Amino acid sequence: IAACLCMACGGSDSKDYWGDTSGGGDEEPTENPNASKPRYIWIDAAANFPDFANSKENIARDLALAKDAGFTDIVVDVRPTTGDVLFKTNHVDQVKFMYAWIGSNYTKVERTATWDYLQAFVDEARKQGLRIHAAINTFVGGNQIDGGTGLLYRDQSKAAWATQMNMQTGITSVMNTSESAKFFNPAHPEVQTFLCNLLKDLASYDLDGIFLDRGRFLNLQADFSEESRKQFEAYMGGIKIQN
């Protein structure tokens, strides 16, 4: 976010950094055909956790800078790659910590605040006249950071939700691989129900949109579970396939 806001400067008047096409020369500025288009700024959860995890004041400060720099839309990452969330829901745990670079150190930043992270952004965006969107890492269920965090590490009853990968050694759960982000199997019906419930809770906020990042299978090696094989066989009209 700091890089995106480098255009901001002091003063209370909003400045149009987007309409001048003169390039700084002596020519008269001409109307920029893109001046009226939306301009988005993406607020990554981990990278901005040191500033925003426990400070509504910092959120207000940086959204004011974004408005002054000419941005029209804020996208807030509320489900990072651990699979836990930064909005109100009963279906998965809240994010309690993230790792971020502070100076030259990769540091664990804990969230001790109890106020609603997403709601703080919504409230401030409305004050600033900005549109507000939420983004989630859709099919991520955990991350190997800090010895393993997220639903797939906490709840062994959800082991079948983890994507199965076609490795040289055979079909293997993503939990037993070096993949840092532990993906769900998008084809699993219980995974779909779980995520739909999350999205219902997310949609209850006063949002202008929801971004579904990582709304996909992990990679070409996934998914090779029995569940996916059966669904694919049914889709192909009953043709039997050997994994």
Positions of predicted regions on the chain:
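Catalytic domains of carbohydrate-active enzymes, especially glycoside hydrolases
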Residues: 57-84, 205-209
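Hydrophobic faces of well-ordered beta-strands that scaffold small-molecule active sites
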Residues: 39-43, 74-76, 132-134, 210-213
